[in-house]
Amino acid sequence: MTTKLFGTDGIRGKANEYPITPEITLRIGQAISRVLRSSGANHNRVIIGKDTRISGYMLETALTSGLVSSGMDVFLVGPMPTPAVAHLTKSMGCGAGIMLTASHNPYEDNGLKIFGPDGFKLSDDLEALVEQEVLYDVKANGVTGDKIGKAYRIDDARGRYIEFVKQSLGNAHLDGMKI
């Protein structure tokens, strides 16, 4: 097993091979929950988005299981651009946002990009804590009963992001512009 999970922009690799396996992804979810709580974050909500890679469904399920088993509520927004997940993390008051994507890497790959409550990349210090918990197999203190988190599908996430983008343009006109 490697001693490093995070690269320059999250965790990436070939889907269903270490570290992008359901088992490790579940542990990442549990670790994120513990790190958020120990950092004093008063958030028990996490948003998860993904790109259209087939492995996204497998990883989304594992990640959700890790988070809800640790008491986090999860908002699933489905296929969404990475900047949308960053924006929704902040605008929905979530403690973290996680994008399941390997960006420009081959379709067989996948990865996790984690945002803090401000909608920016998780700090290096918090990434290091998540990494330690996963690599050193820190045992999860699962919650029981009504402390177990819930998972929700957010059907209007795309519309929320589109409205944000339109508002950010102000009165700018795109007449005559071509792509």
Stretch-by-stretch model annotation:
Residues M1-P19:
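N-terminal amphipathic/basic leader segments beginning at the initiator methionine
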Residues D9, V85, V165:
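A residue-level signal for conserved active-site and pocket-lining positions in enzyme catalytic cores
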Residues K14-L26, R45, G49-T52:
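Short, N-terminal intrinsically disordered low-complexity segments that are rich in Pro/Gly
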